[in-house]
Curated annotation (Swiss-Prot):
<feature type="binding site">
    <location>
        <position position="86"/>
    </location>
    <ligand>
        <name>ATP</name>
    </ligand>
</feature>
<protein>
    <recommendedName>
        <fullName>Nucleoside diphosphate kinase</fullName>
        <ecNumber>2.7.4.6</ecNumber>
    </recommendedName>
</protein>
<dbReference type="Pfam" id="PF00334">
    <property type="entry name" value="NDK"/>
</dbReference>
<dbReference type="InterPro" id="IPR034907">
    <property type="entry name" value="NDK-like_dom"/>
</dbReference>
<feature type="binding site">
    <location>
        <position position="104"/>
    </location>
    <ligand>
        <name>ATP</name>
    </ligand>
</feature>
<keyword id="KW-0547">Nucleotide-binding</keyword>
<dbReference type="InterPro" id="IPR036850">
    <property type="entry name" value="NDK-like_dom_sf"/>
</dbReference>
<feature type="binding site">
    <location>
        <position position="10"/>
    </location>
    <ligand>
        <name>ATP</name>
    </ligand>
</feature>
<keyword id="KW-0808">Transferase</keyword>
<keyword id="KW-0479">Metal-binding</keyword>
<dbReference type="GO" id="GO:0006228">
    <property type="term" value="P:UTP biosynthetic process"/>
</dbReference>
<dbReference type="InterPro" id="IPR001564">
    <property type="entry name" value="Nucleoside_diP_kinase"/>
</dbReference>
<keyword id="KW-0460">Magnesium</keyword>
<dbReference type="GO" id="GO:0005737">
    <property type="term" value="C:cytoplasm"/>
</dbReference>
<dbReference type="GO" id="GO:0006183">
    <property type="term" value="P:GTP biosynthetic process"/>
</dbReference>
<keyword id="KW-0067">ATP-binding</keyword>
<dbReference type="GO" id="GO:0004550">
    <property type="term" value="F:nucleoside diphosphate kinase activity"/>
</dbReference>
């Protein structure tokens, strides 16, 4: 069954020139790009996107980071797209949890600056896609 997920290449990934690498891995996995956009994230969108973390000690720094530079947002589609991209991304902590061969395992060094975001469930994907691409 085909599903959709939101993928973000965060400001650190854009700044380091890793957008092509991330997109290439998505396409080589057999997933399809449905929408793709380079944008500066506004505070309101950042707050809505990370609403589940509101009140946590790292919330402010998370918002500061995601709004610090351009982000590439994409809607990716394919069989098991959510879990397929999360496998490509690797664990949230690039050093302790991300497997070598994953995006974070190959290129990441810090938990907060972990290059990419992928929706973690069908419910999250639906909510996040509506936030980032309301026209879809």
């Amino acid at each position: 069954m085909s599903e959709r997920t939101l993928v973000l290449v965060k400001p650190d990934g854009v700044e380091r020139g890793l957008v092509g690498e991330v997109i290439g891995r998505i396409e080589r996995k057999g997933l399809k790009l449905v929408a793709l956009e380079l944008r500066q994230v506004e505070q309101q969108l950042a707050e809505q996107h990370y609403a589940e973390h509101d009140g946590k000690p790292f919330f402010g720094s998370l918002l500061e980071f995601i709004t610090s530079g351009p982000v590439v947002a994409a809607v990716v589609e394919g069989p098991r797209a959510i879990s397929a991209f999360r496998q490509l991304a690797g664990g949230t902590d690039p050093v302790d949890k991300a497997a070598p061969g994953s995006i974070r395992g190959d290129y990441g060094l810090e938990v907060q600056y972990n290059l990419v975001h992928g929706s973690d469930s069908a419910e999250s994907a639906e909510r996040e896609i509506k936030l980032w691409f309301p026209e879809l």
